[in-house]
Amino acid sequence: MEDDSLYLGGEWQFNHFSKLTSSRPDAAFAEIQRTSLPEKSPLSCETRVDLCDDLAPVARQLAPREKLPLSSRRPAAVGAGLQNMGNTCYVNASLQCLTYTPPLANYMLSREHSQTCHRHKGCMLCTMQAHITRALHNPGHVIQPSQALAAGFHRGKQEDAHEFLMFTVDAMKKACLPGHKQVDHHSKDTTLIHQIFGGYWRSQIKCLHCHGISDTFDPYLDIALDIQAAQSVQQALEQLVKPEELNGENAYHCGVCLQRAPASKTLTLHTSAKVLILVLKRFSDVTGNKIAKNVQYPECLDMQPYMSQTNTGPLVYVLYAVLVHAGWSCHNGHYFSYVKAQEGQWYKMDDAEVTASSITSVLSQQAYVLFYIQKSEWERHSESVSRGREPRALGAEDTDRRATQGELKRDHPCLQAPELDEHLVERATQESTLDHWKFLQEQNKTKPEFNVRKVEGTLPPDVLVIHQSKYKCGMKNHHPEQQSSLLNLSSTTPTHQESMNTGTLASLRGRARRSKGKNKHSKRALLVCQ
């Protein structure tokens, strides 16, 4: 089966000897093995072009860098709230963060894609273009997200917001690809979506015996941070790039001296993304329990200390969106987000409710996903704000007015019984599905040597399993936590603190978290000699 995974790929290997040869021109990564070189010695001209510009030869540039809109088309004020259709708070929170991503929003508002798209249905870029346009051009209103945005993913119960976020980003990246033509793996990393969210890791292993160096470059769309021992995002990043010693049973098999030897392994960011998605690993891979600790994150983040080249000056990112989970485990809870409108004002986006907020409140949340944009990018997009509407803050008056229009339901929508629409059930008609996406990722990631724990959950006989979790929740029938998460339609209107998005079967099956900060891919080898 052809690998259609959107941010998976192969591996490039270079060995510097005496003559340049190439056997796999369609690979997506680069590994360089060379003998000891001075720390700042330049590589050959051919290698410098491959590594510094595109890391590997590109057969086809799918989205030229100049195609990104240079000026902002976004209204200055905040846009619409999103109606909760029943356990869809994770969808709404993720969509709001994407809607207020400046380069993505500006491209969508330019309508460039829809004018040239030849796909008749199932195009996530066209769907997102319609959604972002409606959301930004309807301030003070509540709109209903298109069912096509969650088709193949949402099945009436609580899901993981980060998984849905990356599912959507991957679907948009896939929509950039010419479906009727074969595209090499590295060309897939030249799409407009990768230009916005993507970058490259650099994993460097230095043999301590012969001082030979091996560099491997892997693409990324988001960065997962372990927060178990970290009190701040900066500490988590420092742990991520901390050198690792390889010795003893874990000694490195050097490709230069051709023997097992102690080595030092260092992971750094080789190229920086315009938009940085940092996911804080708050949920246990086994139980799904939440790490409910405060992790500090700054409004301005300097990523230069974590780059391969650390002597090029500050690389400042500014915070523009925060995705928050309120609850005790991945099986239940409620998602909402904070976004920064182009006018510079922060807003809390809690389904249909849109209220003005402050940076102090934003920085005090137990964040799940953080969205940063390069400061130069933010300033460039902010210099040409559309003057069509005056900035204004939405407060209680706007919320009350929306409620009188019948847009808000009496009970919190997260606690209402979901109604599966026929459009969502007809999974076969959708081009991207969660199962297909997970299958492709599983095929291309490094397999663990053993499973720490595998627990089967028991589902009621009348439940249709549309997609399954990577790990099982492990709850038996009539488990107390399971009972507490079942719907109680006769309950009164919950308070804000009680409005947790439990869902019908929210405690039955969990959602797995990627356990690594980067996405490992199936390896492809290319031998280059000179």
From Swiss-Prot:
Entry's Gene Ontology molecular function annotations: cysteine-type deubiquitinase activity
USP domain: residues covered: 80-375
Segments for region (Disordered): 382-413, 509-530
Classification via PROSITE patterns: USP_1, USP_2, USP_3
InterPro entries: HABP4_PAIRBP1-bd, Papain-like_cys_pep_sf, Peptidase_C19, Peptidase_C19_UCH, USP_CS, USP_dom
Entry's Gene Ontology BP terms: protein deubiquitination; proteolysis; regulation of apoptotic process; regulation of protein stability
Localization of this protein: Nucleus; Endoplasmic reticulum
Coiled coil ranges: none
Keywords: Endoplasmic reticulum, Hydrolase, Nucleus, Protease, Thiol protease, Ubl conjugation pathway
The enzyme's E.C. designation: 3.4.19.12
Catalytic activity: Thiol-dependent hydrolysis of ester, thioester, amide, peptide and isopeptide bonds formed by the C-terminal Gly of ubiquitin (a 76-residue protein attached to proteins as an intracellular targeting signal)
Bias type Basic residues, positions: 510-524
Keyword DNA damage (UniProt): no
SUPFAM superfamilies (alphabetical): Cysteine proteinases (SSF54001)
Catalytic residue positions: 89 (nucleophile), 334 (proton acceptor)
CDD domains xref list: Peptidase_C19E
GO cellular component annotations of the record: cytosol; endoplasmic reticulum; nucleus
Function: Deubiquitinating enzyme that removes conjugated ubiquitin from specific proteins to regulate different cellular processes that may include cell proliferation, progression through the cell cycle, apoptosis, cell migration, and the cellular response to viral infection.
Protein name, UniProt field: Ubiquitin carboxyl-terminal hydrolase 17-like protein 11
Lineage of the organism: Eukaryota, Metazoa, Chordata, Craniata, Vertebrata
